[in-house]
Regions:
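Hydrophobic core segments of transmembrane alpha-helices in multi-pass, intramembrane catalytic enzymes
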Residues: 44-48, 125-128, 179-187
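Membrane-helix interface segments
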Residues: 2, 33-34, 73-77, 118-122, ...
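N-terminal, membrane-interfacial amphipathic/helix-forming hydrophobic leader that caps
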Residues: 1-76, 209-219
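Juxtamembrane helix-loop-helix connectors linking adjacent transmembrane helices
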Residues: 27-38, 62-133
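Hydrophobic alpha-helical transmembrane segments
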Residues: 5-7, 38-39, 77-82, 123-127, ...
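Structural signal for membrane-spanning alpha-helices in multi-pass inner-membrane proteins
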Residues: 52-57, 87, 91, 95, ...
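Functionally important transmembrane alpha-helices
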Residues: 18-21, 156-169, 174-219
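Function-critical hydrophobic alpha-helical transmembrane segments in multi-pass membrane proteins
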Residues: 88-91, 111-171
Length: 219
């Protein structure tokens, strides 16, 4: 029942109430789509984290440790960096194949970043992509959704379903969906390997940081 509530928040309430209504208002005030997007990310982070706390932690008297926030060992950190490097290599391969097929990986997000290459804009983009998003997305998609589906359909079933959900929420940036799916699988695998979503958060943050950096460096 609680998972159903989360699905309603993720796929209905948040897209309609936050992204559709508040984004336009924020864009009008800030006058910059990058800043408005990061602000929306922060608002969604607070909402999603609160919903997870309300429906999962408080309701069942759990702790944040129960959804995967546990200390990492040096070995866990090593696995994290190996996973990030592997994900980057595979993602580059996927993007090269897409380019050969005539599918551009440029989208509204990359265009927004490339339109303003100031240090200030870079820092704002990094905060949104490499700080805010990894924290709340890993809590929700790996800490809650992956754990829920893993307990019912096994490790690979949990990875597949949670990664599909993670991919769907990145629509309408359709040309990056293959990479979104791959990253979802890798982050879920890391969580399973290290028994901590902190590893997934770090990997997610590093991957997004590199993506933002490369976007700023591109012509």
């Amino acid at each position: 029942k609680e998972i159903l509530y989360l699905f309603v928040f993720v796929f209905l309430i948040v897209p309609v109430m936050i992204e559709s209504l508040f984004y336009d208002y924020a864009l009008k005030i800030l006058g910059n789509s990058l800043y408005a997007g990061v602000l929306m990310g922060l608002i969604m982070a607070v909402i999603f984290t609160f919903v997870v706390y309300l429906f999962c932690i408080k309701r069942y008297k759990l702790s944040w440790k129960d959804i995967g926030i546990r200390k990492l060992s040096w070995k866990d950190l090593l696995w994290t960096f190996v996973a990030v490097i592997s994900l980057i290599v595979v993602s580059i391969g996927v993007l090269m194949i897409m380019e050969k097929l005539g599918i551009s990986f440029e989208n509204s997000k990359t265009e927004t970043i490339q339109n303003d290459k100031s240090i200030y804009a870079f820092c704002i983009a990094v905060i949104g992509a490499a700080v805010i998003s990894p924290i709340y997305e890993e809590i929700l998609y790996r800490g809650v959704f992956y754990t829920f589906f893993r307990d019912r359909y096994g490790i690979w079933g949990g990875m597949l379903i949670s990664s599909i959900i993670f991919t769907i929420v990145h629509i309408p940036t359709y040309n990056t969906l293959p990479v979104n799916f791959l990253s979802g699988v890798v982050f879920a695998w890391l969580y399973e390997k290290t028994n901590s979503i902190l590893s997934a958060m770090i990997a997610h943050a590093l991957f997004n940081f590199i993506a933002v950096l490369l976007t700023f460096m591109s012509n």
